[in-house]
Amino acid sequence: MTTHPTTAHTPKAAPLPRSRLRAHLVLAGFAAVGLAALTWAAFVQPLPRLIYNPSDSVPGGWYRVEPQRPGADSLSRPLSVGSVVLTTLPPEVAALAAQRGYLPAHVPLLKRVGAVAPQHVCIVAGQVRIDGVPMAAALPADRLGRPLPSWQLCRRLEAGELFLLSVTNPASFDSRYFGPVSASAVIGVAHPVWLETRP
């Protein structure tokens, strides 16, 4: 009996064109959705920022900043007393803050909103009063004995003005020394993410 050698053929998996096409379509769909989401986020709303605050003007820790539209005269949402904003200082105030080491040049700062329009703010004889209620002292000098600007004010805040006032640091450099700031200087509204516990 003659045996004929047989060659074992292992079947090779043939490419499945439909499966590949389907996978490519799904990937292309995800890519298109991702690109559309990025485009929408870039044009419709800026991405939130995460910043760290080491100072005592507001509680120290990490904050998420909801950006303000650039060049807007008023905030997209009205602010209330107690809101924390990331803002720039007027140029002459920023120069003084940098010169004295309160804040590096061109660095925005986090401050609490102490009063908004149409609240009445009065700074007389070293005392800050908001709607007639004493809120803070305006110190004559900083911790190193350097005289602080004596900013006298007794009027209602106008639309688009914010009076920044710390309640956590009596020596904070804020509106009691440089006056109200314009809402157009506000970069965004800060929301605490994680706050430090300090002794």
Q: Which residues does each predicted region cover?
A:
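Protein maturation boundaries and topogenic segments
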Residues: 1-108, 156, 176-199
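Generic structural signal for buried aliphatic residues
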Residues: 82-86, 121, 162-163
